[in-house]
């Protein structure tokens, strides 16, 4: 009987249908509530100790690709659960409709569990459409909500594309509020939304737009800037070094430097260190890595007027305080290199993008399009 298909407990930590697949799956998961209780139910484990194959999958060469969201919001766990139960060997496959708030479509940076699930869904061409619903549709919250329409058997014309439908203003007011709920979607409005969906690329662009899957993807990459240092050596600072650290070898080398240069300010750290290395060799003082760091920390300071500091291989050292992250669209013409050339270099000509840091992320920001 149907009642035997109802299981007590949490869908997340106690899967009542571990081997079943379904034609249709509807879900209205909780918004923005902690799911710490699930960790306790799993055996009082930590988030990074989850091994459930619904939420930790093999993808993109990673045997432990995580679809696990932040502990404060379980919505994407419910979506991942349903995706794991899609029929893959039938002509019609499966269809999922879920109601989510805005966090599931846009929060979570590249590489996070939430973004990873969006990436998995979109790169596997499972996302057919997202429908923005009116605000104040629910009794206990006025927040914006969205329908995810997911299927593994798209029509040919929809393959490789995602439809965004903005139905946020398609609503009828209630004569009397019911909690936060002050509007509804009538059968007539429901028909209007369905017609927008069916019209697909021919739908009114005020309410519906269609994009390639890659439109919503981006590289999150680190933009580095070089370290620039000013060096200031004086007899007073050398004496301060002597009193604090009592390294007579370094003091001897620095005193020789002052004899040659006087109390001096240099904006070329590499030239300064070459001079120090030459003096230390003449004095028979071994310039260890520890002593080099001591001199650098004690006598140099970041200064944008300084020359670029080079490492032992002659490559620019990065200034960690100037490190930034840039989102580069997957569809940007000429890719990461072109983005740096056109969008970053004109303003930061000494910068460079660390390509090894690039991580693919996906987000669906309705406000960008409507």
Which residues make up each language-model segment?
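A conserved structural/catalytic subdomain of Rossmann-like adenosyl-cofactor enzymes
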Residues: 13-15, 19-370
């Amino acid at each position: 009987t149907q009642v035997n298909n109802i299981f007590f407990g949490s869908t997340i930590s106690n899967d009542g249908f571990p081997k079943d697949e379904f034609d249709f799956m509807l879900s209205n998961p909780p918004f923005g509530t902690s799911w710490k209780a699930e960790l306790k139910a799993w055996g009082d484990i930590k988030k990074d100790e989850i091994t459930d194959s619904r939420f930790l999958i093999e993808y993109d060469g990673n045997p432990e690709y995580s679809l696990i969201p932040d502990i404060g919001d379980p919505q994407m766990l419910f979506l991942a659960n349903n995706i794991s139960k899609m029929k893959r060997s039938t002509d019609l496959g499966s269809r999922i409709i879920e109601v989510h708030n805005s966090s599931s479509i846009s929060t979570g940076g590249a590489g996070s569990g939430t973004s990873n699930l969006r990436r998995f869904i979109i790169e596997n061409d499972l996302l057919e459409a997202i429908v923005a619903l009116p605000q104040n549709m629910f009794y206990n919250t006025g927040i914006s909500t969205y329908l995810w329409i997911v299927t593994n058997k798209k029509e040919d014309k929809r393959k490789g594309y995602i439809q965004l439908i903005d139905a946020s203003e398609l609503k009828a007011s209630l004569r009397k509020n019911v909690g936060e709920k002050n509007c509804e979607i009538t059968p007539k409005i429901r028909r209007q939304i369905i017609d927008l969906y069916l019209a697909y690329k021919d739908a009114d662009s005020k309410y519906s737009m269609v994009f390639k899957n890659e439109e919503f993807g981006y590289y999150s990459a680190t933009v580095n800037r070089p370290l620039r240092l000013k060096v200031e050596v004086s007899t007073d600072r050398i004496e301060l070094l002597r009193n604090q650290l009592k390294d007579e070898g370094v003091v001897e080398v620095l005193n020789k430097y002052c004899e040659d240069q006087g109390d001096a300010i240099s904006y070329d750290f590499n030239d300064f260190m070459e001079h120090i290395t030459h003096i230390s060799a003449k004095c028979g003082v071994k310039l260890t890595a520890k002593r080099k760091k001591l001199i650098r920390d004690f006598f140099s300071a970041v200064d944008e007027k300084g020359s670029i500091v080079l490492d032992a291989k002659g490559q620019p050292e990065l200034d960690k305080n100037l490190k930034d992250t840039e989102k580069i669209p997957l569809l940007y013409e000429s890719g990461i290199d072109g983005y740096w050339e056109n969008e970053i270099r004109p303003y930061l000509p000494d910068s460079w993008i660390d390509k090894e840091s690039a991580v693919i992320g996906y987000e669906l920001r309705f406000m960008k399009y409507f």
